Amino acid sequence: MDQRQANGMSIAESQGSGQPQYSGTGRTGILPCQAISALWRDGEITATQPLTDDQIQPSSLDLRLGEVAYRVRASFLPGPGQNMAQKINQYTMHSVDLTRGAVLERGCVYIVPLLERLSLSQRLSAIANPKSSTGRLDVFTRLITDGASEFDRIDAGYHGPLYAEIAPRTFSILARTGARLNQMRLR
């Protein structure tokens, strides 16, 4: 068995399988694409649709919009112990079907459940940020999780769905299921 160190994780390649196995030995860096693929294979990252080949980047995972955008009055976080789905039900003004593409209006705030969800072990956490193309379009977007008290942060051991807050600033935008506005880095 060949053993190497990468980003604070022990990498052991099983003889003959060619598949890297990852076991946390520290939390000192961002996971590479091979580790992200292993997390998908092992079920720590799941999705309602299969991942696409170009979705896994060298050190991040592009996150995809789900089927519905919920228009809300303002930005919010659920807070510790609170569920985003319940907050969405409480604060939704109306919903927008994204399956065929829909316009998200400038100056409005939307919450979109993402296709991906996580079942992270206690050794893994994550951070998120908008993709650079999203910023160039002047679309403000942040990641939210159940129980979050901070945007764009996923606590170690998080199990649950992921949501994007989207607020087009300069122009209204056309959004559809599968569009990628955020990316996530696991550590």
Label every model-predicted segment.
Residues 1-187:
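Non-catalytic terminal segments and appended small domains
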